[in-house]
Each structure stands twice: as C-alpha cells, then as structure tokens.
Amino acid sequence: MAPKAVLVGLPGSGKSTIGRRLAKALGVGLLDTDVAIEQRTGRSIADIFATDGEQEFRRIEEDVVRAALADHDGVLSLGGGAVTSPGVRAALAGHTVVYLEISAAEGVRRTGGNTVRPLLAGPDRAEKYRALMAKRAPLYRRVATMRVDTNRRNPGAVVRHILSRLQVPSPSEAAT
C-alpha cells in the first residue's frame, strides 16, 4: 500500500486545500501529517515546538510520515518542514511526490496572520518566509517527482493539472 500522491511545499502553498480536493477527485482519503501528529500526541504543533523544541517535533513527524507512507493509500499532505529531516527525504524515495511551488510574496499573503505556524510567528514574517524558502526549496525539488506552480492558479486548476499528470487508471481499467 502506498499513497497516490504525497504533497509537499511551503506554508500557504495549498497542501491542505489541494489535498482535500485531490483526494475527493481520486475517491480516496486525505491524511494530513500535521493533524495526525496532533491526534497522536494530544497536543498542538505550536505547543510541541514551544515545550519540546523543533528537534523533538521533527522526530515525531518522521515517525508519523514513515507510518503514513507504509499504511495510507490515499493522498498524503506533509507539514512544510518535513523534508528537512533526512529520514523523511529517504522514506519519500519511490513515491509520487508533488511539490506545490509558490513565490515568497504569495506565500506571505496566503499565510496572513496565521498564528499556528510557529516558524513564521512574530515580526518580519516576510523575511522569515524567504529564509524558509531558501532553506527548503532545494529539498522540495530534490524529493519531488512532479512540480506544480500554484501562483495565481485556483485550487481546481491545480488539482486538474495534477490529475492529468498522475498515472491514474480509469474506473473501467481498474475493474479489469
């Protein structure tokens, strides 16, 4: 069992929105690893970061991602920083990984004043976002099997583009 697609990208790139729509279009479930982490620990991501630190959060995240890659056969949406873990990057090998690309300006606009993003909290959000992009974009590109520009594209158009590039059998082919 393996996910149909694994979505990666910076905060605001559309992983949750695109994930929901893509899963619906494919007739499969969506597993968001950030939600799975909160369910598993009974704590918010912001609380884990504040209390235990980023390193402990990344350890928990890697465990959740590895389990999801082994057990989930729908669409998998990873937290924006999951690819910073070498173990996660290695585990993604052989999977269909879709990098939802976004510009820094669009990412800052989309994330707005969202307080549930610990690494973007506080002043100078635009600078923090650009720093995250500089660190993570090369990692997203390294693990991606498909790159999709989400700038100035509505979610429906992004999903249609992904569907056109996925190797998805039609219902009649799947029945044979």
UniProtKB/Swiss-Prot annotation:
Q: What does this protein do?
A: Catalyzes the specific phosphorylation of the 3-hydroxyl group of shikimic acid using ATP as a cosubstrate.
* Alphabetic keyword roster: Amino-acid biosynthesis, Aromatic amino acid biosynthesis, ATP-binding, Cytoplasm, Kinase, Magnesium, Metal-binding, Nucleotide-binding, Transferase
Supply the name of the protein.
Answer: Shikimate kinase
Can you supply one Gene Ontology CC term for this chain's record?
cytosol
Task: Please tell me which top-level EC class this enzyme sits in.
Answer: transferase
Instruction: Please tell me what else the database record remarks about this protein.
Output: The phosphoryl transfer proceeds by an in-line associative mechanism. The random sequential binding of shikimate and nucleotide is associated with domain movements that suggest a synergic mechanism by which binding of the first substrate may enhance the affinity for the second substrate. Was identified as a high-confidence drug target.
Spell out the residue ranges making up region: LID domain: 112-124
Query: In this UniProt entry, which cysteines form S-S bonds?
Result: none
Example GO BP: shikimate metabolic process
